[in-house]
Amino acid sequence: MTATILDGKATRDEIFEDLKVRVSALKDRGITPGLGTVLVGDDPGSAAYVRGKHNDCAKVGITSIRRDLPGDITQEKLDATIDELNANPDCTGYIVQLPLPKQLDENAALERIDPDKDADGLHPVNLGRLVLGKKAPLPCTPRGILHLLRRYEVPIEGAHVVVVGRGVTVGRPIGLLFTRRSENATVTLCHTRTRDLGAEVRRADIVIAAAGVPGLITADMVKPGAAVLDVGVSRTADGLRGDVAADVAEVAGFLSPNPGGVGPLTRAFLLTNVVERAERVAASLG
């Protein structure tokens, strides 16, 4: 068996085409969505991520709002920048790029973001709304995972989903999405200290690997025909590596590559969250 590849780049391009139409319709009503980014310091990886997000904005017609700050900035200066974006009517939604320099309090910065402008969908208020089943901006990577599975018609309802990883961006929130009544999956949350991880993963119809451990999920751990999504990213001497070993492709029914699988959809749904908020603003104006 050779796995069907879940092509995140092609799926992202489909989303971008849809967003172009929606942004054009908003502009016809006098509303131009704007994505803001707050980048502190000169970390090459963070700078590349931010640059990619603004390149995406240009493709769909969203205005870019950049706030690039020196690495030695104080918490007070960062807070003032966040407050400015909260109040800026041109900024529909924004993100604070992580990690921040050590002198800054990441949690305090993220909590200061206006929850309605939370483009990442990771503000504590919005995660709380997700727990309660209320409408809120959804976390981008979990949303991208769900969309990719649906795009390739991978059965979700009634599926047993095993998530490996307990981070706030993927591992913790994704179970909340999969167990909604619109998905009706059963979720097991595992991590690197799970006893007999292989036995847990082998029970899965869908495996989401998000632990940040290179090659953690191997072919002998995967049920034949299962869908495997590789979300983990680790920097190694050989470059960036995902959590899924290469031999999984011979066992899985569906496999998201890394890079090129879920990553492009994370960025696509960042823009989607911004456009959706702009549409809510337009609807409120009548």
Curated annotation (Swiss-Prot):
Keyword Protein transport attributed: no
The answer, when asked if Membrane is one of the entry's keywords, is no
Q: Name one GO biological process term.
A: L-histidine biosynthetic process
Extract the InterPro entries matched here. Aminoacid_DH-like_N_sf (IPR046346), NAD(P)-bd_dom_sf (IPR036291), THF_DH/CycHdrlase (IPR000672), THF_DH/CycHdrlase_cat_dom (IPR020630), THF_DH/CycHdrlase_NAD-bd_dom (IPR020631)
Q: Which UniProt keywords apply?
A: Amino-acid biosynthesis, Histidine biosynthesis, Hydrolase, Methionine biosynthesis, Multifunctional enzyme, NADP, One-carbon metabolism, Oxidoreductase, Purine biosynthesis
Q: What is its EC number?
A: 1.5.1.5, 3.5.4.9
Which SUPFAM superfamilies did the record assign? Answer: Aminoacid dehydrogenase-like, N-terminal domain (SSF53223), NAD(P)-binding Rossmann-fold domains (SSF51735)
Q: Name one GO molecular function term.
A: methenyltetrahydrofolate cyclohydrolase activity
Annotated catalysed reactions? (6R)-5,10-methylene-5,6,7,8-tetrahydrofolate + NADP(+) = (6R)-5,10-methenyltetrahydrofolate + NADPH; (6R)-5,10-methenyltetrahydrofolate + H2O = (6R)-10-formyltetrahydrofolate + H(+)
Report one GO cellular component: cytosol
Pathway(s): One-carbon metabolism; tetrahydrofolate interconversion
Q: Where does NADP(+) bind?
A: 165-167, 192, 233
| CDD domains in the cross-refs | NAD_bind_m-THF_DH_Cyclohyd
Name any one Pfam family assigned in the record.
Answer: THF_DHG_CYH_C
Among NCBIfam families, the record links this protein to: PRK14193.1 (NF010789)
State whether it acts alone or in a complex, and with which partners, per the record.
Answer: Homodimer.
Q: Which HAMAP family match?
A: THF_DHG_CYH
**What task does this protein carry out?**
Catalyzes the oxidation of 5,10-methylenetetrahydrofolate to 5,10-methenyltetrahydrofolate and then the hydrolysis of 5,10-methenyltetrahydrofolate to 10-formyltetrahydrofolate.
Similarity annotation: Belongs to the tetrahydrofolate dehydrogenase/cyclohydrolase family.
The protein's name is: Bifunctional protein FolD 2
Question: Organism, per UniProt?
Answer: Rhodococcus jostii (strain RHA1)
What lineage is on file?
A: Bacteria, Bacillati, Actinomycetota, Actinomycetes, Mycobacteriales
